[in-house]
From Swiss-Prot:
Homotetramer. Its EC number is 1.2.1.3. Disulfide bonds: none annotated. Keywords: Mitochondrion, NAD, Oxidoreductase, Transit peptide. NAD(+) binds at G278, S279, T280, D281, V282, G283. The active site is at E301 (proton acceptor), C335 (nucleophile). This is Aldehyde dehydrogenase family 2 member B7, mitochondrial. It holds the Pfam family Aldedh. It is an enzyme of class 1 (oxidoreductase). GO terms for molecular function: aldehyde dehydrogenase (NAD+) activity. The keyword Transit peptide applies. It catalyses: an aldehyde + NAD(+) + H2O = a carboxylate + NADH + 2 H(+). It comes from the Eukaryota.
Amino acid sequence: MASRRVSSLLSRSFMSSSRSIFSLRGMNRGAQRYSNLAAAVENTITPPVKVEHTQLLIGGRFVDAVSGKTFPTLDPRNGEVIAQVSEGDAEDVNRAVAAARKAFDEGPWPKMTAYERSKILFRFADLIEKHNDEIAALETWDNGKPYEQSAQIEVPMLARVFRYYAGWADKIHGMTMPGDGPHHVQTLHEPIGVAGQIIPWNFPLLMLSWKLGPALACGNTVVLKTAEQTPLSALLVGKLLHEAGLPDGVVNIVSGFGATAGAAIASHMDVDKVAFTGSTDVGKIILELASKSNLKAVTLELGGKSPFIVCEDADVDQAVELAHFALFFNQGQCCCAGSRTFVHERVYDEFVEKAKARALKRNVGDPFKSGIEQGPQVDSEQFNKILKYIKHGVEAGATLQAGGDRLGSKGYYIQPTVFSDVKDDMLIATDEIFGPVQTILKFKDLDEVIARANNSRYGLAAGVFTQNLDTAHRLMRALRVGTVWINCFDVLDASIPFGGYKMSGIGREKGIYSLNNYLQVKAVVTSLKNPAWL
């Protein structure tokens, strides 16, 4: 039953309205600007990379799925097929888990010193940097994010995260503590075993690093499932891991769908831990499958509807630019996006006008072109879902300041969209849209905005923009979220833990805190006869 619900959630698709959103309100703001952009997205650039790996990576070898099935991965710029990828299912997960279990129980990986493991991870980081452009091109082709973002931010961050955890590998240790009698008492920090990891499509490389890095540093083996929308970059990364010297079976990569491969990992009796990043609805199902199988440990990084609070003392120009980045980065496809922009009434009108102007200037187009800020959404399902939410916003009475429709006639491009006069109970203010839609809400004082910001089922992150230290500290303490960015946003260094309160997840990724996700603590008590001291 849970598997069927996974299928329902993953296959759900909203149909977009055949009418322009502008026609609903008789609006045509920025029409010439968007007309020029629309013409620019029609001609696509040939990506500077070849697809070499489309099979599953199991036991150190690239292999076809047992069923022989494949599925297409699509170019979001035009909906055309990039490649046919092997479609893993439960049988393939069984093979991958068996390979991971053998590597953990019998292979050289658990017998290596921690220093030897760290050297492999450092070599891997070197290979990432060597292949930076190739990895970035695959990421952009499969996902649609700007190539400059992939090449200058995300692939370097991928290498940085693995260097961070390579440094941790030989610093993981237990403790000794005094007992109440003649005993030697110590703890051992041991790898948890076979870790199942399910990563999303919005940041395939970064989410892979946040999960693989600590798991490998702690000495575990892994079965990783990629998102069906973006399987390609992980397969190249898997090849580079083996070039770095990773033993066969330590990391196994299965491309496939949530209802089959994902559910098989979460419910597998020989998987000791599962980590998932994705929607809250699917996260609940992962938790259910884990509890009904072998009660495996679970880490969940789920949805968000993060408040971005602009206080009355803010420099409006700076606040507009930061709020724009907080929402529109990565086509708005960020779990922690600042998607509820709360602005103090004193500066609200000025902020709205400048936010509208900034959205109209946003450079949207083929992500392989230089200077592009926004590419297409990842697929037709996400594209149609976003357009439906925009329609909801218009019909609910929010004021459409900019955007509101698709851009161009092919591909999954959406105009940068800004709503003002948004009320807390509108769907565009409560639901995770996961797209380039900024909602701007007005507030009067701190007590009010704290209550409204916390009135959400989510609690992943928040942004605060103020020049007052007391205000910053009050909001920092009062907001029920896992991360608060003060006068900045999306600072995601490898050492900074990331995770949510409430329905935004369980546990933390990155930093020292993530190591606990992949370790067991064993207490060892040894009786001593005639000890010299206690």
